[in-house]
Every structure is written in structure tokens, then in C-alpha cells.
Amino acid sequence: MEENEVESSSDAAPRPGQPEEPSESGLGVGTSEAVSADSTDAATAPGLTEADDSGVGQSSDSGSRSVEEVSESISTEPLPQGYLPDSSSVSRGPVAEVPGGPPALVHSSALPDPSMLVSDCTASSSDLGSAIDKIIESTIGPDLIQSCITVTSGEEGGAETTQYLILQGPDDGAPMASSMSTSTLANSLAAIEALADGPTSTSTCLEPAEQPPGEPSSLAQPPAPVVEELDLQGLEAMMEVVVVQQFKCKMCQYRSSTKATLLRHMRERHFRPALAVAAAAAGKRGRVRKWGTSTKTTEEEGPEEEEEDDDIVDAGAIDDLEEDSDYNPAEDEPRGRQLRLQRPTPSTLRPRRRPGRPRKLPRLETSDLHDGIGEPLVSSQSTQSPPELQDLEAPSSSDLRALGKVGRGLVETGVSQSDAENAAPSCQDEADVPPRRRGRPSRRFLGKKYRKYYYKSPKPLLRPYLCRICGSRFLSHEDLRFHVNSHEAGDPQLFKCLQCSYRSRRWSSLKEHMFNHVGSKPYKCDECSYTSVYRKDVIRHAAVHSQDRKKRPDPTPKLSSFPCPVCGRVYPMQKRLTQHMKTHSTEKPHMCDKCGKSFKKRYTFKMHLLTHIQAVANRRFKCEFCEFVCEDKKALLNHQLSHVSDKPFKCSFCPYRTFREDFLLSHVAVKHTGAKPFACEYCHFSTRHKKNLRLHVRCRHANSFEEWGRRHPEEPPSRRRPFFSLQQIEELKQQHSAAPGPPLSSAGPEAPQEPAPFQPPETPPLLCPDALGGATIIYQQGAEESTAMATQTALDLLLNMSAQRELGATALQVAVVKSEDVEAELTSTARQPSSEDTTPRVVTLHVAESGSSVAAESQLGPSDLQQIALPPGPFSGASYSVITAPPVEGRASASGPPYREEPPGEAAQAVVVNDTLKEAGTHYIMAADGTQLHHIELTADGSISFPSPDTLAPGTKWPLLQCGGPPRDGPEVLSPTKTHHTGGSQGSSTPPPATSHALGLLVPHSPPSAAASSTKKFSCKVCSEAFPSRAEMESHKRAHAGPAAFKCPDCPFSARQWPEVRAHMAQHSSLRPHQCNQCSFASKNKKDLRRHMLTHTNEKPFSCHVCGQRFNRNGHLKFHIQRLHSIDGRKTGTSTARAPAQTIILNSEEETLATLHTAFQSNHGTLGTERLQQALSQEHIIVAQEQTVANQEEATYIQEITADGQTVQHLVTSDNQVQYIISQDGVQHLLPQEYVVVPDGHHIQVQEGQITHIQYEQGTPFLQESQIQYVPVSPSQQLVTQAQLEAAAHSAVTAVADAAMAQAQGLFGTEEAVPEHIQQLQHQGIEYDVITLSDD
């Protein structure tokens, strides 16, 4: 009882003559939901029809039936009996007869024994009700009374008996307050069913012993009447309180958690029509209840009902707006969730349902019954009972009396569905209207109650046809029908085309699509050709023709052509012109910090940066500055560029970046301070942007806009910052005008070209460290060789050197010296030289960076030259000389040559070595046929400029020049003319134009075969076949399968002629047989595959000795050093600046030895005087390249000794480049980047891990590349064995070999070699492998 308390209350019966007030349970005098009476009272009712006699439980003083009977007569379906807390189920209990009043129904569960039921005839019904109220209030408490059900029955005299029935449905799921047996509950249900069988049944209680098995007690035998006086105190033991959780109406599916709400629902939903009919016919006495809704006549309800025909009806009252929702009839069960028990509140404070028509019961048309009064009764079921089974409801006895007086012939009454049902008690008063707010009203004001306050336009609806699927409105019924048919399966958000399979989620998209089938848009402007899919667009467009708009000023026409100010080429876009302008400039602003390359375009620069990104693992790339990792190279590059952005000024509030600080300050002031600096002069408008202010003035102050616009002119649209300034454009114009090459020679004299004055050093050293620089290769021309052949031979050696491409901007020169006898033989055919013309002639070949070559011949008097005498070379019986000019202090005057003549014999033994040939802007003194001199200046681009003829000595003859590079597009260079007179007379001699493509000097009467053979620079060492390119020569050498046989290196095909194999190899050119086993990369040769494999291993074997950065290619390392760690783009050899070239005069062999010893010792300290003497006593050729060794530790010494001990070459390298070689006479010079020799007589040249040249000894077999295996060098291996050294000891150059071995054995010559030595070599960027030759 304490845990499950139930509130219950009752009101005292009102006295006759007093105004009727509503009770707490919601029932009044005239609205009882269950009235029970015996059959004797029912028989005395006058004027009852046959249908009335069939009722059950009629009152003794009225002809109306009870609520339960009406429900039973209407519904043909059995309702669930689990919901007992219903007002109609009260009459099914046993009857307690009370003297002086009608029998009162008592629930069987309240009686522990039927025999205990007491009947007291003397006790009044009011006293009984008061006594029961007191018992329940004392037992349960007044705060729990509201949850109990009260049933009131009235007498004609006004006395009422109130009986309290505490019920609980079996499906409520709430715990019972006290133990109530299931059999007792079954007895109650059986009694209810028994009472429905006939009107004269008397409710009795049977003894438990007399009940048949399985039958309820109320059906077995009526109980004996109780005649003893009712003990009011004893009733307390007869009461049992049960927790009430839910109440259900049996006439419909309405449910409620409180009894008062259910009773109010039954009174207003099911009993209101009977009261309305009675009041209208008999003039009901008394005023209308204050809490009831005002009764409306049929005439009053008619107009509003017609207006609301299309509303969706609702079948349930809502007593709480916040917690209850519209009831769904399909949900019969509470789905296991128990409703929260609410504490009842006074009716004035209780939330009311929103007024309006019921939402869930279908409304039927009103039928006139008995003078047009009454409506047909509507049940919750779809089928109705026959009219004879439908009964009238009698809310109270007083109402039934009125009905009996005015109309006994009423057949049936209906259920009122007026708007006033469930209205608040104060609905008669004028509703309080809240102050109207702007905007859309709240949801609480969307009901019909507030419709009268809405604004109703007198105009008819523009679109009267409404789609009930999606809510769209249309102008015509045809449009509505087409729209409804287009709905896909009734989906409001999906439309389909009726002529094709098109689907859309927008109605507008479907309309636009439908005109693809029609071919034209439906709406067209009457004054122009404008058409649209929508009529509203045409109406909006028509305003253009109807009103006089003020024309805006014509916008500034956009430029469609952008001419280049330099060359005049026209582009349609500004950015195209900007890109083109970069081609006129030599500036490369984007430089790679890894390899030093520069680029004009940023896009090309970014694409280049992708080559430096290396994979970490599994094709993933990691940022160099943070821990960011991704799988896309471009994404990583963009991320890394954010670390090193070229816009250093970044906003601290947003991602904005800029390259100017004032731009950043302006950005912060406008965007992040909230300031609006642009204010209107005519109003209070202000904005952050100037363009918005202009738009505001033009729209809001149109009359003043013209004047305002004159004071604030519109700025032209800002374009991208120009790439070139006006000054730069003018400079480019001047360069472009002078670009078409040197002008043609004219007959008149040219203005003298002022040379840069020479500044001799203050303290010249004995010999510069780079005295052997310039990559000047010295060859002696034999008597049987022509000048062209000698030049070609020298150039072949030069171009075959791998160091040729490492010099960068440094120019290369090849000087070919001709002896006196050869020179006299060559020049005799042209003219007879004078007696003094015995100076040897020098042929100088200048190779510029662009690839062009220029050959020149000159003669110099050797009297004032610094000389080095060397024995005759092996190529001819005569001696040879290399002559270049020392720095000239002044121009040659007309008085004669500045150098004195020497006997020819001495001149033949003279040699001068210096590095001035490679310096651009240097003046060289070159002689013609006689002893006269002239000056030639080498410019930076490789061209030769001649001084003015006025500055030359009389009788000077121009040398013969010939261009050996590819032909230029511009006009040929012609030399100035000068008259030359023999024997005091002057004559003219003009150098021939450089029209020949052959390399070498154009010699008079030279055979055509010599000039033709010079076109092919490279020759095979096996078959002596010449080739124009090195690549073709290498392909030819790889195909050699013997002296007179060729084989395809990629397949078994072989032939005896090279052209056949070459044609066959062309079939393999498109194939890529070498594939990477880790990705889809494939290459045509193994070299590219090996280079590609480094990207997977992330191996970078080449490191920079300056900054420590590592590279996977040696070429990248060299380019990096040249661009970043050099002065003016040249490689750094020493930390000090290079001193001007000096030439030292050596007139004896002792001075020569001393000078060479000093030079070698200052650089490397490897060769002594005796060893140099031994080396120079033999026939050697010194080949020198520019030296970049800064100290002794950076030098590396490599020794080559063949197995027979006949050939020795001593290579001194630094920075992975050959510095110089001292080799035996007659040995072909191999200058590789990486040089390894095996003791089988194979001289193998290796460049970047790829064999580029193999020299075979006599009688050795030829090997294919597949037969060569690369084995890494281990510290225990020896490149030069002791047996090889012993064999070399018997050769003619043992001293040189010993000297080289003495320096090299610390690195890799003896057994004591340690891993640190190998690491030292690898740190220097030199990788050496032992190459093993296999016989298979």
C-alpha cells in the first residue's frame, strides 16, 4: 500500500436546487457514464419503444441506455477486455441493494466474500457516499484520490450514491497495491458479459462453493440480498486500492493516463449530441456549465464545416500539448512503455488540447432526424451496426426527462464533431490574443482557432491547385495533373520523365528536361526574342522594356591582343605574353639548391624538384623539414614549398601570405580589425572594400552617382605584377636589335676595339698551380700527316675525354704544333716564304661552350718566349712545340715586330705551356706567313674579333679560319680587309668565310679526302671504321663479335656487315627489355636501369666535400659543386683567388726538371727529381687537365699495369676527375671518371657504373657485356698484385711505376689495406669495382 498508492477523490452529491458544479473526477449530475438499474424500474418507464426495451441496465426514471450498452450496440467487434479501468465496466460488478435508492454496483474484487455485502435500507445514498469517501481518504490519503474512478448514479428525488471502484487492467504492467486474485478478476469480467445479455438480469454474488468449475461467480447464481445494516467502518476492510496506469475508451481507441481526461473525452466526444438535442428542444433549465463548451446549432456549424472539409480528421483528444501527440489508431498496444502517472491539477490550470476538429475519425454528412436535429452515430470501426442495434446515450436522468417530454420518437442521435469539443471551460469568453509579432507565427498559432486573426487578401489565390504530395501549387489543373503524374511512386522528392527514363530530385530540373522533347521554351517575351522555361522569368524580363532604366556607362573594352614590346609578337592573353618575355631574358631566377641548376619558369623548376624527392619505403615520401609523409610526389613538393615559401610575410590570423610587408599590414587592418574604412558621403553606410562602396552609391544614390564617380574615378582592374620593368624591356630591345650576329665586313675600316688592359700581378709565383690547365692537349704533327688530320686527331682525343663535359663554362683548346720542315712543305705551294720565315706555325682549336670550334694558325718569334725544351715526340722525327702568346703590354706598332728572331733550330725545340687559351677576352699574338704579328681576341661566346687594321703591323696576313661546329643561322663571320704588299707594297688579303663543316685547318692544295674524312670524328679501334657520333661508335663496338663479324647484343641475330646489324638493332629501339623488379620502370639499356634502382634503395654514393650533401649521380654532384661552390660558375680548386697566368723561361733541361718537380711537389709531392729525370728521359706525353686539387689529402692515385708489364699509366685524380696522366709512349690515352684494370690485358673504362670502352690486347677474345660480372671491392682484394709489379719492374718505366706504387699502396696496393682506405675513396665520390670476366 505504501509503495503503490493511488490518488482518488469524489465529490459530494449536489443538493437539489443548487447549481451543478463539475466534480474533481470530471462528472456532473447530467453526465454519468454508467447508470445501473434493475428490470422493475425499466418496466415502469412510459413511452419506450421496442428498441428501448432491449437495452440493458436502464435507469428507473429514464429511457436512455448506459454508456456500455451503447458501445456494445455500436461495435460489432469484440474489444479487448484487458482494460478494466473504464467507466462502462463498472456496471458489470455485483449489485449492492441499498434501501431508498437504486441498486449500486460494486466491483467483485472489492468483496472478499459475497455474503458479506451489507444492504441498509435506511441509510441514504449520500451518507453512504460520504462514508466511503471518508474511509478512502483515511486509508489512502486525499492526495491519491484523483487516480480512482468514481461512478455516480442519481435518483429522481435528487439523492445520489457514490461508489468507488479501484481497478487495474491486466495489461498495464504495474505492480498491484494489494493481492487481488485472478479468479476474482475473471468473475468481474464474466459478470460484465452476463449483464450484457438482457435488461432484467440482476447482479448477484454466488458462494464460492456453489460455483461450477471454470465459471465465474457472477454467472452461476444470484447472491442473496443483504438485509442487515451497513457497517460504515466495516467497509474499510472491503475496499482494495489498485494502481491505475491507463484508461481506455471502449467506443474508440482513445487512451489516457488520468481518469478525468477519459471522462471528459467520453462526455464531449460521445454524449454531447444528446445533450444538445435535449437543450434545443425543451429549453434546458439552468445555465451552461462553465467548464463545458458552448453548444452550437447545426446552422452555426454549417459554414465552418464546409470550409474545413478538406482537413484531415483526428480521432483522439490530446490533454497535454508537450507530452501527448496525435494518436495513431494502428498502435493499439502501448509497446511495453508505461505512461508516466500524472498528478491531476485543477481544470483551470490543466493544459488543454488545441481546439479543432477531430483528426482521426471520418466525418459523416449530417442527416436530419426529427426536424433536422441529430447526427448519425459514428464508431471507431469502419462498419456500422444496423439502426435497430444503435442505442441512445443518456448522460443523466434529468436530461432523459427532457428528452422524454419533447420527443419520444427519436431513433438515434449522432456524435458531435464541432470545433468546440474539448474546448477549455472558459471558451465562451473571448480568447486572449497575444500581441502579433513580425515574421512567421509560432506553431501554437497555426491552428484553426487563430485563423480568424490571419490576414486574408481579397485577391484570389494565384495558384489555386495544390499538390497533396509535395505541397506545390499550380495555375491550372492540367499543370497539377502533369506534376502529380511525374511523382516517382508518390515520393515528394523524386520526379520522373513520362517520355524517357530521366529522373530528377527537382521539379524545375524535370521541367527544363521536358523541353528537350518539345524543342522550344514555352514562354517568350513579346518585345524581343527572350524565352524561358518559367513564366516568372519572362515577367521579370519584361520590366526591362516597360521602365526607363538609366544606362550604365559602357565598360572598358578588354584587350584581346598583347604585343611583345621586344619582338612584336602578339598574344591573346597577358600571361602568355609574360611567359614569352622570359625567353628574351637570360635571367633564371629559380635555382635549385641541391644541384645548382637554374630555370626561367617556376613550373619547370618545380618539375625539376620532383627529381630530387626520394622514396623512404613502399613508395612513400617524407618531408625534409617535418614528419609529413605521403604517397604523392607532387603533394609532398607543395608541402615542402610551404616551408620555404617565397612569400615571407604571413598573416597570423589566416593563411594569407604576401611578398611585401605593407600588403600584410593592409590585410590585417581591413580583414582582422573590423574596421570599415570606406564610408558613404550621403548616408551612414561603410564597408571594407572600395568596390562595395561604389556599388552602394550607384544603387542607393543614383542621382548623385555621376558626380561622385567624377570625384572617385574607377581604377582599372589590377593585373598580375609585371615580370619586367620598363627599363628591362628597353634593355631587351637593344639586345634583340643586336642579336642577329656580327655584321658583314665592309670595305671601310672598322673602329678599333679597345681591349681590356692587362694588369700583371705584383708578386708572380714561380709557376701557377693551374699552369697545366685549360685542358690543352698537345700533339705533334708528323711529316706524313696533314694539318686537318692532326687537328682531327687532337679533337677526337679531346671529345673522347669524359672531362670535356665537366668543365662547364670553361673553354677548351687544342693546339697542334707543326715542325719547321712540315710547315715549309705545306706553305711552299701557296707562296714562297721569306728567309726569316722559319718560325714554327701553331694551329689552335678553340671549342666554346656552345659546341662551335674555330681553328687558327699563327707564327711567333720565340726570342722573348719562355721555353721548355723536350726531346722529339714519337709521331715524327722532328721536334714539336706548343706556342701561345704571353700577355701583351701594348699594341704592335708599325715599326716592326716586338719579338726578335731566333734561329729555326732553337725555335723547333721550344715549348710554352700556360692557361691563357681558355680565358675569354685574352689577346693572342698570332703570326701569318712572315714574322709580322697580329692580335686576335677571343670573346666570351667563342667568336673571334679582329683589331682595327690601323693597329696592325705592315705586311701582316690574316690566318685561315674555319668553323668546325654546326653551321649558324646568322651570316658567316668575315674578317676585315688589309692591303698587303710584298717588298714594301701593300696588298689585300681577306680571310675566307667559315663555310666548311670539317674540323681542321683549311690548307691550300689539301686533298679532298682529308677534308671529307674529317667529318667523322670517332673511329672503331677494332676495324678502324669511322663514325660521326660517339653513340653510333659505341653501338658498333658492342655489336662486334670478331674482327669481321657482328652480333646483335639483344638477340642471337648476327651478320658480317655492320649496316645489316644496325638495321636489325633498330627493331629493338622501341623495346625496353630491362625492367625493374620493384615497379613498372623499363629501359633500353642496363645503365639506365642501374641508375633507376638507386631510387628504390635511396642510395646516394656521391657526396659534396664542401657541404656534405649527397647525390645518387656523379653528374649531379659535379654540377652542384660547379654552381654552388665555385666562383663565376667555375670549379673551385683552391680557396684563394686564381692568380693571372705566368710563363717561365726554361732554357735548359735542368731548369725544366726543377720546374716540373716544383709544380708536382707543390700540388701532390709525389715525384722527385731523379724519377722525373727518368720519366723525361723516356718518350712521354704529358696530358693535362685543369687541376682542382687543393691539398695532398684530396688527391687519389691510380696505377694501371698490364699483365705483360709493357704498359704503365699513372693517373692522378681528384674530385673523381683525372688531373693528369704520365704514360708510356704509344699508349692510347684513356681518361675515364672511374678506371679499373684487370690482369687479363683488358683496359676497361667505366663511367657511372656502365662500361663505355674496353681495349683488348692482341689475341684476346671479345667479351659481351653479359659475360662481365661486377663484384664489389673488399679490403682483402688487390687491384694490382705483386706478380704484376714484378712484371712491371722489367719494363722501361720501372721508376715511374715504383713512384706511383709508393703513393698508391697505402690505399689499395698491399695486404695492409684497411676498410678506412676504401671509405676514404668512397667519401671522395669514387666507386671502384673489381670486374671479373667470364668465359661463358
From Swiss-Prot:
Gene Ontology CC annotations of this record: histone methyltransferase complex; nucleus
GO biological process entries: brain development; brain morphogenesis; cerebral cortex neuron differentiation; epigenetic regulation of gene expression; in utero embryonic development; neuron projection morphogenesis; positive regulation of lymphocyte proliferation; positive regulation of neuroblast proliferation
Compositional bias (Basic and acidic residues): 362-373
PROSITE patterns for the chain: ZINC_FINGER_C2H2_1, ZINC_FINGER_C2H2_2
Family matches, as InterPro entries: Zinc_finger/UBP_domain, Znf_C2H2_sf, Znf_C2H2_type
Main localisation: nucleus
Biased composition (Low complexity): 31-45, 54-65, 339-349
Region (Disordered): 1-108, 199-222, 282-398, 415-442, 732-766, 961-1013
Superkingdom of origin organism: Eukaryota
Compositionally biased spans, kind Polar residues: 378-387
Sites bearing Phosphoserine, chain numbering: S975, S1006, S1148
Biased composition (Pro residues): 752-766
Protein's UniProt name: Zinc finger protein 335
Organism encoding this protein: Rattus norvegicus (Rat)
Gene this chain is encoded by: Znf335
